[in-house]
C-alpha cells in the first residue's frame, strides 16, 4: 500500500506552508494515501488562525495539495508580555516571536485582559456587525465588583462605549448602534451596563 508522497500548500501569506503542514494529522511518507480523508483535512486546516477556507485535492500518484483562502486579523493584545492575535473567525494564538506585530497594529488593541476574558471577548466581538467593529480603536478590560466583565470600547471619533462581554452582541446590533448614535450624536459616553443605554454629553464629564 502506498503512502502520501508529498504535501504542498498554496495561498497562505500570514502563516507559512511549513507551519500548516506541521500541524496536519496527515504526514508525507508516513500516512497511507487511501486513509486520507479530504474533508477531515480541510476541517483541521480551517481550525488554524487566518484560514477562512481550505480546499484539498489528491492526485493519482500520492500527492496532496491544499489551497488556502485567508481571512484577516481582527484584534490583538498582550497578556503577560506575550502578543495574542485573533482573526475574523475568532481563532486566536500566541505570537511569542511577534512575527505578526506589524500586520496587526492596524487592528483594535485589547488591554488589561487575562486569557479567559480575552477568549470570551473575541468570541463575542467577531459576531458584531462590521459597522460597529470598524469604529473601534481599542478595548480596555475594566472589571469591578459590580461588573466582572465590564469593557470600555474606545471609538475612532472619541466616543466611548461601556459594555459587558456577555451582553455586547445583543446590545451592539447595527440597528441599536445607529439608533443611539443618531439620537445622541454629540454625546461622548454611552453606558450599556444598565437595562437601557445611558448617554452622557461631552461637556458633562
Regions found by a protein language model. Give the residues of each.
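Juxtamembrane extracytosolic/periplasmic "stalk" immediately C-terminal to the first targeting helix
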Residues: 4-13
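Short coil/turn linker and secondary-structure boundary residues
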Residues: 12-15, 36
Amino acid at each position: 500500500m502506498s503512502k502520501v508522497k508529498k504535501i504542498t500548500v498554496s495561498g497562505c501569506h500570514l502563516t507559512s506552508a511549513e507551519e500548516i503542514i506541521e500541524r496536519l494529522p496527515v504526514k508525507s511518507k508516513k500516512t497511507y494515501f487511501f486513509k486520507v480523508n479530504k474533508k477531515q483535512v480541510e476541517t483541521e486546516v480551517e481550525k488554524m488562525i487566518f484560514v477562512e477556507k481550505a480546499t484539498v485535492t489528491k492526485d493519482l500518484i500520492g500527492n496532496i495539495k491544499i489551497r488556502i483562502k485567508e481571512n484577516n486579523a481582527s484584534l490583538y493584545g498582550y497578556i503577560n508580555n506575550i502578543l495574542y492575535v485573533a482573526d475574523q473567525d475568532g481563532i486566536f494564538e500566541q505570537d511569542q516571536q511577534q512575527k505578526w506585530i506589524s500586520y496587526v497594529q492596524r487592528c483594535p488593541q485589547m488591554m488589561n485582559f487575562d486569557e479567559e476574558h480575552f477568549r470570551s471577548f473575541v468570541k463575542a466581538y467577531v459576531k458584531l456587525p462590521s459597522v460597529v467593529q470598524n469604529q473601534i480603536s481599542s478595548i480596555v478590560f475594566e472589571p469591578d465588583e459590580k461588573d466582572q466583565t465590564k469593557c470600555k470600547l474606545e471609538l475612532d471619533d472619541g466616543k466611548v462605549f461601556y459594555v459587558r462581554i456577555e451582553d455586547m452582541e445583543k446590545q451592539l446590533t447595527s440597528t441599536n448602534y445607529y439608533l443611539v448614535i443618531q439620537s445622541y450624536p454629540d454625546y461622548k459616553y454611552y453606558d450599556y451596563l444598565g437595562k437601557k443605554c445611558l448617554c452622557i454629553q461631552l461637556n458633562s464629564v
